């Protein structure tokens, strides 16, 4: 089994990669082959000489495009990881501080995995910060949604994940053509997709 980890570190976010890599190598799916696909504006990073680290040149797009355009970045390079069993995007500033096993983490019956946003836990769905703009493709109506998910950790079986990033890339592109940016960028688009 092989797992692809998609990681964006441009600009100031490059400082996180060393600790990220060390913690994920030690604790995240320790018995499974992992490859880190690192989108970066640097020619070299700590551990970039490792066989399981693949640097992908990516200029710093600035705010909010560094997050908003991630689905386009991933789909542009999908040939690199399309044959992996699972693919996950994980935020640059995450650390894996305890052992996480395949049995605990990898979706088996489901195709995708997302994580509830800590700030939304236990909230009434009407109080969650879904995008409420009906012109936006991330729009969530007031009677929809029950859990608000974070944009910083998502993935699953690679085929299903690629389907998701293609859909979200297309929605973001269509919104941009209409002069619209979702409230919380990629996270708003992800929430709309997960709700259905």
Features from the language model and the residues they span:
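Conserved core of the sugar-phosphate nucleotidyltransferase
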Residues: 122-132, 148-152
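GT-A fold catalytic core of metal-dependent nucleotide-sugar glycosyltransferases
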Residues: 71-124
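Catalytic core and acceptor-binding pocket of nucleotide-sugar-dependent glycosyltransferases
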Residues: 142-196
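Hydrophobic/aromatic beta-strand patches that form the interior of the parallel beta-sheet core
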Residues: 37, 54-56, 88-90, 112-114, ...
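Short, flexible, basic/aromatic active-site loop/helix in glycosyltransferases
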Residues: 130-146
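A conserved donor-nucleotide-binding helix/loop in the catalytic core
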Residues: 58-90, 183-193
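N-terminal anchoring/stem segment of glycosyltransferases
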Residues: 1-66, 77-83
């Amino acid at each position: 089994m092989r797992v692809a980890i998609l990681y964006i570190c441009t600009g100031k976010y490059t400082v996180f990669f060393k600790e990220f890599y060390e913690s994920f190598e030690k604790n995240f799916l320790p018995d499974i082959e992992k490859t880190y696909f690192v989108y970066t504006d640097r020619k070299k990073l700590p551990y970039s000489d490792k066989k399981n680290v693949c640097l992908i040149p990516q200029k710093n797009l600035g705010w909010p495009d560094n997050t908003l355009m991630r689905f386009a970045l991933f789909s542009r390079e999908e040939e690199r990881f399309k044959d992996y069993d699972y693919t996950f995007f994980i935020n640059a500033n995450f650390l894996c501080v305890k052992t996480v096993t395949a049995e605990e983490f990898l979706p088996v019956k489901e195709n995708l995995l997302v994580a509830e946003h800590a700030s939304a836990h236990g909230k009434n769905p009407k109080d969650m910060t879904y995008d409420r703009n009906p012109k936006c493709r991330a729009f969530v109506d007031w009677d929809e949604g029950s859990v608000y998910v974070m944009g910083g950790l998502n993935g699953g079986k690679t085929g299903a994940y690629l389907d998701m990033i293609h859909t979200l890339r297309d929605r973001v592109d269509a919104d941009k053509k209409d002069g619209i940016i979702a409230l919380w960028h990629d996270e708003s688009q992800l929430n709309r997709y997960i709700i259905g």
